[in-house]
């Protein structure tokens, strides 16, 4: 549970799962996506390991992504089996509902960069209130009213929107 004004520290760490010894890192990247209507990046809050580059990127669709990457230009660097890549902070500006900080585009390259190791990440849901507003976008069709639901609950299927010359193919569930 969080409140407007709280600061959330987001950390990216790599942990080798196949062995306990260090390894040679050639390249890695991760995008940690967040909703700028719910979070605000705290300026100058990024702290990273040596050689890690960071960028805050605006994405299509309105989300933002805090991008962290490393590229070795000299045949790789020795890294410990567990390495803290970096942290950054987000200020909660949302006043209701919840939002997910999503781990996307995580890649750890093999030597030569033509493939990558399997990776997993953990998304984090930050909850201000458990009441969420679900909005429907009909792309120029008839209006579909917003619904308020408790976090984790399902919405009630609304009436199908109409748009001249188009037929609704179906709803996602």
Task: Say what each PLM segment does.
Residues 1-131:
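Acidic, low-complexity intrinsically disordered segments
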Residues 129-173:
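Secondary-structure capping and domain/repeat boundary segments
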